[in-house]
Amino acid sequence: MEGLEESFKAIVEVLIVEILFFLVAWYLQSIEASNYGWTSKTFMMILGIAGVIIHKRPREYGLIPKNLKFDLKWSAYTLIIFILTSISTITVSFFLNHLRPIKLNVIITDFLWFFIFVGFAEELFFRGYIQSRLNEVFDRRFESFLWVRFEWMEGTLITGVIFFGLPHILTAINPFKGRIILTPLIFLITISACFMGVVLGVIRERSGDILLPTVIHGAIDFMTFGVGRLIGLALSNITTGIALFLFFLLIFEGMLKDEA
């Protein structure tokens, strides 16, 4: 009974925090605040840090690197895959004369946005605060993930699907503006977010912190949308798909089994 009560308290806690984020983000969007995206993601970071501070366990909540050598090693491998894949596609686009003009400051801004205000902000909030909090009470363990023998926790699954993946539908909704724009693309994005939310959660469990998931998250979004400015979103989505295929094929299993 006590365990059920603690689980309920944890769910209510993180649910309130996530609802608070969406209410603020929706409001900022409804008043058409300049740079509302930057402001809302800053608020997300503040909420994530506050959650970690309140529970007084920054290392357990992934804010402090547990194994920096591990993080840097697998971050480098990940970036090599994404960079080489991007270069290949950009090169082909160049010779086909399909490259779009883009200023350097736009590339720098996109890099900052996708790695810090999307990658870091969301990993801090979801994998740092929410996943860590839920794994304190939802501690049932699974023995493998996909084809890899690796033990991971139920709280990671709940976070990745219910608190990270499914809420992507809410990006198409704004109750303050009376807007509901649900398209097949939104549902496709939501399904992929549920899957990648669990993947990033499992990697966060393996690494012990949010650094590596942040790099992976940032690389995916920067390649899709940042590089997409240069080669077009259709081609950049294909490129991201290829990079993820290579990621799972070449390094994912080694990452989870690395004893370093």
Could you say what each language-model-derived stretch is?
Residues 1-86, 90-91, 104, 177, ...:
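N-terminal, membrane-interfacial amphipathic/helix-forming hydrophobic leader that caps
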Residues 3, 67, 99-109, 146-151:
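Helix-boundary and loop/linker segments of multi-pass membrane transporters
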Residues 43, 50, 94, 98, ...:
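Generic, low-specificity signal for short hydrophobic/alpha-helical stretches with a mild N-terminal bias
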Residues 86-102, 166-178:
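Alpha-helical transmembrane segments and their membrane-interface junctions
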Residues 108-260:
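Transmembrane helix-loop-helix hairpins at the membrane interface
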